From Swiss-Prot:
Organism: Drosophila mojavensis (Fruit fly)
Keyword Ribonucleoprotein assigned: no
Residue ranges, annotated region (Disordered): 594-615
Molecular function in Gene Ontology: ubiquitin binding
Gene encoding the protein: Uaf1
The protein's name: WD repeat-containing protein 48 homolog
Keyword annotations of the record: Repeat, Ubl conjugation pathway, WD repeat
WD repeat coordinates: 26-65, 71-110, 113-152, 164-203, 206-245, 248-287, 290-329, 349-388
Source taxon at top rank: Eukaryota
Functional description taken from the UniProt entry: Regulatory component of the Usp12-46 deubiquitylase complex. activates deubiquitination by increasing the catalytic turnover without increasing the affinity of deubiquitinating enzymes for the substrate. The complex deubiquitylates the wg/wingless-signaling receptor arr/arrow, which stabilizes the receptor and increases its concentration at the cell surface; this enhances the sensitivity of cells to wg/wingless-signal stimulation.
Family: Belongs to the WD repeat WDR48 family.
PANTHER family: WD REPEAT-CONTAINING PROTEIN 48 (PTHR19862:SF14)
UniProt GO BP: double-strand break repair via homologous recombination
Keyword Repeat: yes
Subunit structure: Catalytic component of the Usp12-46 deubiquitylase complex consisting of Usp12-46, Wdr20 and Uaf1; regulatory subunit that, together wtih Wdr20, stabilizes Usp12-46. The Usp12-46 deubiquitylase complex associates with arr/arrow; the interaction leads to deubiquitination and stabilization of arr/arrow.
C-alpha cells in the first residue's frame, strides 16, 4: 500500500493542463517585457502566454525563433539579463521568480517567496543584485551569484526584504551600482530605499494614479516615472521633489526607455503612441510610431538606431528612431534637428490569442474563437485540437454542434494565457461529476443501449499521470498486470500539467512525459491531492450521483391499477428505457425484453413467453414515458430530462402509459434503485 503525504494544512488543490502544440514558436498573447543581449543579438521576450522566447535579431530572415523557455504557467511580467547574459531572471503572475540558464534555456531554480503576482524586477549590474516586487506589497533583494549556484542539495537561499509599502507594487528600478532602488505602486507615490542598508530614505508624491514604469539615472540622482495618469515626471532625489512634468500622452504611460546620457525619454503609452521627448525641453518631441495596441514594453536594438516594442498584441516590432547623424539621442544637442522615424525595421509575428470559448452540452468538446476570428473545436478529454473550422459564424457553429444532452460540468476553461487551460478540481465544479455511456466516443461503440459507464474526470487524470510511478510503492503482484493509464487512450506527452492551490500559488509543473522521472515522481507524491491519488494510484471509482423522481400512471391509462405516486431513486445517468423496463416488469408485471447487456434475461423471457408477440418488443416500444406533457426519448438519461424537460427544482416526475393493451395484475415491485443495481 502506498502512503501518500497529504501536505497537512496546505490549501485545497486543483489540477490544470494546457491544450497546445508541442512547440509554440509564436507568442499567443501580449508580450510584457523585453531584454536584448547586445553581445550576440538575442532578444528575450516575456509573454502573457507564460512562455519566454528567444529571437535572433541579427538575421534578416523572417524566421527569427531560436527557442522557448518554459516553466511558468501564468503571465511572465518582467525579465532581466544578468551575469553578462549568461543568466536570466523572470517574474510571473504564478507568484514565482525563476532563474534560468539563458544560453541553454532551462530553469535552474524557482523562488517562491512572494505570495501574490510578481510584477517587476530591477537589476544592479555592478553588484549582480536583483530585486523583485509584486502585488503582495513586498520587495525582496537577491544575490544573483547565490541564485545561480543553487542545486537540488544546496537549495537554501537568504534574501533581504524592503518593508514599508502599503499597496501593490507595479514598477521597480535600480541604478547599476545598486545604491538606489525605487518602487511605484497603486499608492500613486514613489518610495526610495538604499538597498545596501535596506533602509527607506524617502517617498515622493505627485502622481494621481498608479506608477507603472520607472528608470533611475546611473548616478542615482534622478528618477523618471510614468503613470496611469498620463504624465511623465522627472524627480531630483537630492531635492526630494519633482522637477519636471511632461504631458505628451493622452492615456497612461506604461513603458520608459532612456538615452545613454539620460537626456532623452522614449515613452510607450496606452494611447498606442511611442514618443521621443527631450527631458530638459519637453516641447522638443517627435512621434516614433503609432502601434496597433497599447504599448507594454520598449527596448533598443543592437545599434540603438531603433526600438523594439511590444503591445497587447502578440507581434514584436522594431521601429526606426528619429536621428540626426545617428547621435541625436546621445549627443544632447539642444539645436539638433529631428529626422523622420517611424519606419518598421523588423517584425516578429505572433500568433492568435483565444478570446471566446463555449463548452458544448456533451461536456467533452469546446469551441473557441481567437483574435483573428478563427474558430476551432478542441477535444478536452483527449487534450487535442479536433477540427479547425476557419472564419465561420461562431454562434451558428455552437448551435449546430450542441446536442440535447445534459452532462454536469466537470471542468472549467481559463483563457488568460491565450491558449485553452483546462482546470480540474473538487470545489465549485467536481471533476468526477461526469458519468457517461462508453459510446461517448472512446472505443468504437454504436449501441446506445450499452450498460458500460465511464467517468471523464477519472479517465483524464489517469491519462495525464500515466507515467507516474510513485516512490516507495509496493511492487506489482506477479499475478496482476501493472496497470497504467486508463486503457482507452493517451494524451500528448508534451502537455503541461500544473498542480496549484485553488486561487493561489503554483506547487508543481511538469510535462506528461516527465512524470516518470525520479524527482518529478517524488514531487508528485508530495504535492498531488488525495482526490487525485485515489483514482490514479489506488484506482478507486468515483461515487455515482443519484436523482430522486416520482413515477405515476398517465391520466390516459386505460386500466391504471394504482394512482398513487411512487418515489424512486436512481443513478443520474440511467437512461429512460430502464424506467420503461421498471414500469413494465415491476409495476405492470408484464414480460419484458430488456435492452442489450441483459442477454440471459432476454433469452429467459423469450423462452417463457415465446407465444406472445408483444412480449418480444423492448420495453420502450411498449411503454411511453411523459414528463411535463412531453413524450420522453428512451435514450435520454434522467439528468437530461430534468435539465431540458422538467426544468424545475422539485423532484422529477414521470407519467407512464402503455402503447398497446397488455394484461397485468398491477402490483408494485422493488424500487428502481434496486433494479438499477442489477444492471
Amino acid at each position: 500500500m502506498l502512503t501518500h503525504k497529504t501536505c497537512q494544512a496546505r490549501k485545497k488543490m486543483q489540477v490544470s493542463f494546457v491544450i497546445r502544440d508541442a512547440e509554440e514558436k509564436q507568442h499567443r498573447n501580449g508580450v510584457n517585457a523585453l531584454q536584448l543581449d547586445s553581445n550576440n543579438g538575442k532578444l528575450y521576450s516575456a509573454g502573457r502566454d507564460a512562455i519566454i522566447r528567444v529571437w535572433n535579431t541579427r538575421t534578416e530572415a523572417n524566421e527569427k525563433y531560436i527557442q522557448s523557455m518554459e516553466h511558468h504557467n501564468d503571465w511572465v511580467n518582467d525579465i532581466v539579463l544578468c551575469c553578462n547574459g549568461r543568466n536570466l531572471i523572470s517574474a510571473s503572475c504564478d507568484t514565482t521568480v525563476k532563474v534560468w540558464n539563458a544560453h541553454k534555456g532551462f530553469c535552474m531554480s524557482t523562488l517562491r517567496t512572494h505570495r501574490d503576482y510578481v510584477q517587476a524586477l530591477a537589476y544592479a549590474k555592478d553588484r549582480e543584485q536583483v530585486a523583485s516586487a509584486g502585488l503582495d506589497k513586498a520587495i525582496f533583494l537577491w544575490d544573483v551569484n547565490t541564485l545561480t549556484a543553487l542545486t537540488a542539495s544546496n537549495n537554501t537561499v537568504t534574501t533581504s526584504s524592503l518593508t514599508g509599502s502599503k499597496d501593490s507594487i507595479y514598477s521597480l528600478a535600480m541604478n547599476p551600482s545598486g545604491t538606489v532602488i525605487v518602487s511605484g505602486s497603486t499608492e500613486n507615490i514613489l518610495r526610495i530605499w538604499d538597498p545596501r542598508t535596506c533602509m527607506r530614505s524617502m517617498k515622493l508624491r505627485g502622481h494621481t494614479e498608479n506608477v507603472r514604469c520607472l528608470v533611475v539615472s546611473p548616478d542615482g540622482n534622478q528618477v523618471v516615472s510614468g503613470s496611469s495618469d498620463g504624465t511623465i515626471k522627472v524627480w531630483n532625489l537630492g531635492q526630494q521633489r519633482c522637477i519636471q512634468t511632461i504631458h505628451v500622452h493622452k492615456e497612461g504611460v506604461w513603458s520608459l526607455l532612456m538615452s545613454e546620457n539620460f537626456q532623452y525619454i522614449i515613452s510607450g503609452s496606452r494611447d498606442r503612441n511611442i514618443i521621443v521627448t527631450e527631458m530638459r525641453n519637453p516641447s522638443n518631441k517627435m512621434l516614433v510610431c503609432e502601434e496597433k495596441a497599447p504599448v507594454l514594453s520598449l527596448g533598443y536594438n543592437i545599434d540603438k538606431t531603433g526600438v523594439w516594442a511590444t503591445t497587447w498584441n502578440s507581434d514584436i516590432r522594431c521601429w526606426k528612431l528619429p536621428m540626426y547623424d545617428r547621435c541625436v539621442l546621445s549627443s544632447g544637442g539642444m539645436d539638433a534637428q529631428w529626422t523622420l522615424g517611424g519606419t518598421e525595421l523588423a517584425c516578429i509575428k505572433g500568433g492568435a490569442a483565444i478570446k471566446e470559448c463555449t463548452v458544448l452540452n456533451d461536456k467533452r468538446y469546446i469551441i473557441t474563437k481567437d483574435s483573428q476570428d478563427q474558430v476551432v473545436v478542441y477535444d478536452v478529454l483527449r487534450v487535442t485540437k479536433k477540427e479547425e473550422l476557419g472564419v465561420v459564424d461562431y454562434e451558428e457553429e455552437v448551435k449546430k454542434r450542441n446536442k440535447q444532452v445534459y452532462i454536469p460540468n466537470w471542468f472549467t476553461v481559463d483563457l488568460k494565457t491565450g491558449m485553452p487551460t483546462i482546470v480540474l478540481g473538487q470545489e465549485e465544479v467536481d471533476c468526477f461529476a461526469a458519468w457517461v455511456s462508453i459510446e461517448a466516443g472512446l472505443p468504437e461503440c454504436d449501441d446506445p443501449t450499452t450498460e458500460i459507464k465511464i467517468n471523464y474526470g477519472k479517465l483524464l487524470l489517469e491519462a495525464l499521470l500515466e507515467y507516474w510511478t510513485p516512490p516507495h510503492s509496493m511492487p506489482p503482484n506477479e499475478m496482476e498486470p501493472d496497470v497504467r493509464g486508463n486503457g482507452y487512450f493517451q494524451v500528448p506527452k508534451h502537455t503541461p500539467v500544473i498542480f496549484s492551490e485553488v486561487g493561489g500559488r503554483t506547487v508543481c509543473r511538469l510535462l506528461v512525459r516527465d512524470a516518470a522521472g525520479d524527482s518529478e515522481s517524488t514531487l508528485l507524491h508530495e504535492t498531488a491531492p488525495q482526490w487525485v491519488t485515489d483514482v490514479v494510484i489506488e484506482r478507486n471509482i468515483p461515487k455515482f450521483l443519484k436523482i430522486p423522481f416520482f413515477l405515476q400512471p398517465h391520466p390516459q391509462m386505460t386500466k391504471p391499477e394504482r394512482t398513487k405516486k411512487d418515489r424512486l431513486v436512481a443513478n443520474e445517468f440511467i437512461q429512460c428505457r430502464k424506467v420503461c423496463e421498471h414500469v413494465l416488469e415491476k409495476v405492470l408485471n408484464a414480460e419484458t425484453t430488456p435492452s442489450a447487456g441483459n442477454a440471459n434475461n432476454s433469452l429467459q423471457n423469450s423462452q417463457s413467453d415465446a407465444n406472445s408477440e408483444g412480449s418480444q418488443l423492448p420495453a420502450e416500444e411498449r411503454i411511453e414515458l411523459w414528463c411535463n406533457d412531453v413524450i420522453v426519448d428512451p435514450n435520454m438519461d434522467l439528468r437530461t430530462v430534468r435539465h431540458f424537460i422538467w426544468k424545475q427544482s422539485t423532484d422529477l416526475t414521470f407519467q407512464y402509459k402503455t402503447k398497446q393493451n397488455f394484461n397485468f395484475d398491477g402490483s408494485i415491485g422493488d424500487s428502481l434503485e434496486r433494479v438499477t443495481r442489477k444492471y
